[in-house]
Amino acid sequence: MKILCIFLTFFFTVSCGPSVPQKKTREVAEKKRECQLVRGACKPECNSWEYVYYYCNVNPCCVVQEYQKPIINKITSKLHQK
């Protein structure tokens, strides 16, 4: 009975959550998707008319230089006093 309890504890501890390779695969897929959203491509090296947006796994995400990164402006509201 004690062995069964130890086995079940080990089994449930090991089986919880995704394994490390699954997490890595998911992260790589997310980075490739983000790269495609900015009209880029993950490839071994960028051409002269492209720049590195960020790295997908080990390869750079190459984006054409015409693409501008979005500028985030803070929206501030001021109350007008009369």
UniProtKB/Swiss-Prot annotation:
Disulfide bonds join C35-C61, C42-C56, C46-C62. Keywords: Antibiotic, Antimicrobial, Defensin, Disulfide bond, Secreted, Signal. The keyword Disulfide bond applies. Residues 1-16 form the signal peptide. InterPro entries: Beta_defensin_dom (IPR025933). GO terms for biological process: defense response to bacterium; innate immune response. GO terms for cellular component: extracellular region. It holds the Pfam family Defensin_beta_2. It comes from the Eukaryota. It is found in: Secreted. Belongs to the beta-defensin family. Has antibacterial activity. This is Beta-defensin 113. It comes from Pan troglodytes (Chimpanzee).
